Amino acid sequence: LDTHALIFWSSKEWVSQNFLNFLDRQTAKGNVFVSSISFWETALLSKKKKIEINNIHEWKSGLLENTNIRIINPSASDMIDSTLLPDHHKDPFDRLLIVQASRHKAILVTKDTSILSYSVDTFWV
């Protein structure tokens, strides 16, 4: 999941019921991967008051306890490879998510149209 998809799904706001149902079904099957980078990005957004999460640790714990998401951690190679991507997208978080999705042969759930320029499968409901 792209970070915004994770935030939207966890808050159940700004997304359709179809989106929520789709992710709930995929999570139950163990098919939803979330990069640990997304938790870092979410914490930064919360700290900067760009999103409202009262307690980031409780938010993360609740998410992990109430879902079957699979956390993936970036490797040193992922980090290096993210710098070698074409410069269509400048956001280092998204570049790393692109590399991780590609490595895991996963579909990246995102509405970020800049990501469409890369060789990674994307999806948005």
Which positions does each model-derived feature cover?
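Donor nucleotide-sugar recognition loop
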Residues: 87-93
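Acidic, PIN/NYN-like endoribonuclease modules and their adjacent C-terminal/linker elements
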Residues: 66, 96-125
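Conserved beta-strand segments of alpha/beta enzyme cores
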Residues: 31, 68-70, 121
